[in-house]
């Protein structure tokens, strides 16, 4: 038993923030915990790597609750070839194909959710199965140490899977299964590994029953609205600079809430840009992001700017940022806040 415990690793990830601002015309100020993860990983052998992550969050009444974020068995084929490296399968409550990839390029999930999640399309985990692998051999250690050791395939990486479709916030409300896939390529391979081009596809239905009725049962409309997304991202990572540009177009969303009066899925489209200027000589970064998203002709623009300081390694960060949301025909909302990310190990 003691020998097995030596193969268990424990990690934490916390986002602790305090800020003030204006939301829908009303002033606010608060201190809050936006993420509280406790993760246990078990690696008894290289080919079997199960994981469980508990997520502590605060509900609308202010009560603190613990829920599962991930709980899966992961099977890895520990090989490195000229074609694929470390193909693996996650089964259970698993990573989706996209967000773990994007959040290892834009390292500021502590500020808030990523582009398509921020606009209500999808969240980051679901119950199902994910297949993933690196394309080609791994990039040289020098690149991994100076730029990034995440998804280090010489020619990119792929991930795809089939999921219940409710995410990790909700039970499955229909029998539909959702297909999601990501393809990321380094078009110049190891010649210019900094550049990646990625494509995300989502094909399924929103997480509602086949028929949705009001409380009286008299007014009903068809459920299971279409949920489609096509998104592309170009990214460039360097020791001193990171930039991404995204475009997306689709219909509907994961929860099935983005619909018209007849229950049909709303169309959507948007674009986003992110940049980080790294200042390693003072363990700091300047970050900026711009989002535009449009649901059926109603758009929202968002601007984010911040300064980050890293201490005791790359995982512990203090971020001071300003976030402003500007909806068409509505009242701007904004927040200035300080966030501390604590990551162990």
Language model: regions and residue ranges:
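Detector for outer-membrane/organellar transmembrane beta-barrel domains
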Residues: 1-11, 176, 184-296, 301
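Outer membrane beta-barrel
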Residues: 1-165, 173-180, 184-191, 271-278, ...
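Outer-membrane beta-barrel translocator domains and adjoining extracellular loop/strand segments
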Residues: 21-27, 61-68, 102-107, 143-146, ...
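Well-ordered beta-strand positions
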Residues: 41, 235, 308-310
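Flexible, glycine-rich linker and terminal segments associated
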Residues: 285, 316, 342-345
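C-terminal closing repeat unit and adjoining cap/tail of repeat-based domains
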Residues: 306-321
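A short, acidic, flexible beta-alpha connecting loop/helix-capping segment that sits on the rim
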Residues: 322-328
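Outer-membrane beta-barrel "beta-signal"
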Residues: 332-345
